[in-house]
Structures are given as structure tokens and as C-alpha cells.
């Protein structure tokens, strides 16, 4: 199951964030949002 405010697709969870940041900061931010999360 995906966290609230996340979408499920092909057994994975996705969420769009509106904050603009570089790839490194975005990956760090993403991994902090949910265990096992990575920037796609």
C-alpha cells in the first residue's frame, strides 16, 4: 500500500512534489519522504 497522497502504478508508489531542486537534493528529499523511496 502507498502512503496517503501517493499514487500507485505497477506495484510502485509515486508522488509529485512542486519544490524545485537539483538532482542530488531531490534524491535526498525523496529518500526522506518514505522508506525505500528514490527519485524516479
From Swiss-Prot:
Q: Which GO terms describe its cellular component?
A: extracellular region
Q: Does the keyword Disulfide bond apply?
A: yes
Q: Gene3D superfamilies annotated for this entry?
A: Mannose-Binding Protein A, subunit A
Q: In which tissues is it expressed?
A: Expressed by the venom gland.
Q: Where is the signal peptide?
A: none
Q: Which UniProt keywords apply?
A: Disulfide bond, Hemostasis impairing toxin, Platelet aggregation inhibiting toxin, Secreted, Toxin
List the InterPro entries hit by this protein, alphabetically.
C-type_lectin-like/link_sf, CTDL_fold
- Residues annotated as domain C-type lectin: 9-40
What subcellular locations does the record give? Secreted
Q: What Gene Ontology molecular function terms does this protein carry?
A: toxin activity
Q: Give the intrachain disulfide bonds.
A: 2-13
Q: How does it assemble?
A: Heterodimer of subunits alpha and beta; disulfide-linked.
Q: Which family does it belong to?
A: Belongs to the snaclec family.
The job of this chain, per UniProt, is described as: Platelet antagonist that specifically and reversibly binds to a site on platelet glycoprotein Ibalpha (GP1BA) close to or identical with the site for vWF binding. It inhibits the binding of vWF to platelets and vWF-dependent shear-induced platelet aggregation.
The name this protein goes by in its record: Snaclec tokaracetin subunit beta
**The organism of origin for this protein:** Protobothrops tokarensis
Amino acid at each position: 500500500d502507498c502512503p496517503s497522497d501517493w499514487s500507485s502504478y505497477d506495484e510502485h508508489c509515486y508522488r509529485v512534489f512542486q519544490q524545485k531542486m537539483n538532482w542530488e537534493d531531490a534524491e535526498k528529499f525523496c529518500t526522506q519522504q518514505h522508506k525505500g523511496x528514490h527519485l524516479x
